[in-house]
């Protein structure tokens, strides 16, 4: 028997980056979790169905976080005076090593999953650690919470501390075993191949992971061109490759299956060509890019090449879980890029940033992040009454104030 859900309220979503659709006191109808109608009145076929009326509240799509490190949740706000590589060595690697203990993992991951719920993040793409058992704990907790995610067991077999490094062969064996075990979580929580970044993965490991991604038909996530020191390091490790991006491409870790790369701040035009060719998604992480002095990603330039873009909190390089705050930070950084760097690339608009935080990132999951017909229904109910305002506002203005 089909399950029908009808929501009533002030509806807002972005079917395209340039456009808000706003429907005052409108209706969303979903059958078996998929939107079949969104409009001003109830079609006759559904006239007898129960309606959940949210009054004057706003109804928006759930947020999508395309890049976060779940094990770093307790490190938020630490090391903001350091750049990427010293920050990893001082704070990140010691914390991630603790996840060899599954009980510690359950404690931290439980708090992280609760934070996703509290901030309206209904879909996420997450890094775990190198520990397969702890990564399965994260997947279990997400499934029990009813949150959809791609979760990665991290791979690292070089240039890593002794307490957080794998042997190449064992890393691939563990990854295969983890992929097999991940099938228990069904369609809601899925695995994603996760080489940490090129400096921490040998060519043998990267090639093996590329083969596993194709064998199991699972997507790939990693980091790309976040920091100048990192880029120089990659060049010294792989002098045979023309650029950082092509190291991934040559190891079949870009474009053979759906791929998302975090940061992408310092890409050359040739690398942007490769991103466009492979339709690799960029996870733009504005808070992290500022906190670790990495730079400001050329988002408008990437948009002009029709490269898919989502937003990432990048916990804990980023210190805030809320994607509402991440999207407003993305707008602010785009203004600085425009004023200080290149007047040819206009700042992001609210609709563009909101799109990235919903449908833009949601594309990695399929038809997600919008209330268009055929989309999976992820919805947030927003009560903005505490934001005192005696003036009449449009729905877009109310949303902007709440964000």
Predicted regions and their residues:
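Divalent metal-coordination and catalytic microenvironments
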Residues: 10, 28, 33, 56, ...
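N-terminal metal-binding scaffold of metallo-dependent hydrolase/deaminase domains
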Residues: 1-46
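His/Asp/Glu-enriched, well-ordered alpha-helical/loop segment
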Residues: 250-256, 300-386
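Metal-coordinating catalytic core of metallo-dependent amide/deamination hydrolases
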Residues: 133-265
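C-terminal cap of metal-dependent C-N hydrolases
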Residues: 16, 376-403
């Amino acid at each position: 028997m089909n399950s029908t859900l009808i929501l009533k309220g002030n509806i807002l979503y972005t079917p395209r980056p340039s456009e808000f659709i706003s429907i005052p006191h409108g209706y969303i109808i979903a059958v078996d979790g998929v939107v079949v109608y969104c409009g001003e009145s109830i079609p006759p076929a559904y006239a007898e169905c129960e309606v959940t009326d949210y009054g004057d509240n706003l109804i928006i799509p759930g947020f999508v976080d395309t890049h976060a490190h779940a094990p770093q949740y307790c490190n938020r706000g630490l090391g903001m005076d350091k750049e990427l590589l010293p920050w990893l060595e001082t704070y990140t690697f010691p914390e991630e090593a603790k996840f060899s203990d599954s009980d510690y993992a359950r404690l931290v991951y439980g708090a992280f999953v609760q934070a996703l719920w509290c901030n309206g993040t209904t879909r996420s793409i997450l890094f775990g650690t190198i520990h397969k058992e702890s990564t399965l704990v994260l997947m279990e907790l997400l499934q029990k919470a009813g949150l959809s995610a791609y979760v990665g067991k991290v791979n690292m077999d070089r240039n890593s501390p002794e307490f957080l490094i794998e042997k190449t062969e064992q890393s691939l064996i563990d990854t295969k075993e983890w992929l097999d075990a991940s099938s228990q979580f069904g369609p809601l929580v899925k695995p994603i191949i996760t080489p940490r970044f090129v400096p921490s993965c040998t060519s043998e490991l990267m090639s093996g992971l590329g083969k596993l991604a194709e064998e199991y038909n699972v997507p790939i996530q990693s980091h790309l061109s976040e920091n100048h020191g990192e880029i120089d390091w990659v060049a010294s490790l792989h002098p045979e490759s023309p650029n950082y991006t092509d190291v991934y491409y040559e190891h079949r870790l870009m474009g053979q299956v759906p791929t998302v790369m975090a940061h992408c701040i310092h890409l050359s035009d040739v690398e942007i060509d490769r991103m466009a060719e492979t339709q690799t998604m960029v996870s733009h992480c504005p808070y992290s890019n500022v906190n670790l002095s990495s730079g400001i990603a050329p988002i408008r330039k990437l948009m002009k090449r029709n490269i898919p873009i989502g937003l990432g909190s990048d916990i804990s390089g980023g210190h805030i879980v809320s994607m509402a705050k991440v999207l407003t930070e993305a707008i602010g950084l785009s203004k600085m890029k425009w004023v200080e760097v290149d007047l040819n690339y206009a700042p992001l608009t609210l609709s563009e940033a909101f799109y990235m935080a919903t449908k833009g990132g949601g594309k990695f999951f399929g038809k997600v992040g919008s209330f268009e017909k055929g989309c999976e229904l992820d919805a947030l109910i927003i009560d903005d009454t505490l934001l005192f305002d005696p003036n009449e506002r449009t729905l877009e203005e109310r949303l902007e104030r709440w964000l």
